[in-house]
Curated annotation (Swiss-Prot):
Residues 14-59 form the F-box domain. SUPFAM superfamilies: F-box domain. InterPro entries: F-box-like_dom_sf, F-box_dom. This is Putative F-box protein At2g33705. It comes from Arabidopsis thaliana. It comes from the Eukaryota.
Length: 69
C-alpha cells in the first residue's frame, strides 16, 4: 500500500473559502477558458453545480458573445 503524506500549504492556513463572496468567485471563474472550466468541474460538487447552473452559463454566453465583435 502506498503511503500518502499531507502537504502543509501556508497559503491555505487561516483562509476560509466560505468568506469569499460568491459574486467574486463567479467573476474569477468567468475568466477561465472553456478547457479549464471542463477540467475544474472535478474540483468539487459545488464547482460542478456552479458551472452547470443556468445563471453561470448565461453569464458566460453574454461575456463570450460580447468579446466576439
Amino acid at each position: 500500500m502506498m503511503k500518502t503524506r499531507a502537504c502543509s500549504n501556508p497559503m491555505n492556513e487561516g483562509v476560509n473559502l466560505e468568506q469569499i463572496p460568491y459574486d467574486l468567485v463567479l467573476e474569477i471563474l468567468l475568466k477561465l477558458s472553456a478547457k479549464s472550466i471542463a477540467r475544474f468541474r472535478c474540483v468539487s460538487k459545488l464547482w460542478d453545480s456552479t458551472f452547470r447552473s443556468r445563471y453561470f452559463t448565461e453569464l458566460l454566453f453574454i461575456i463570450s458573445s460580447s468579446m466576439q465583435i
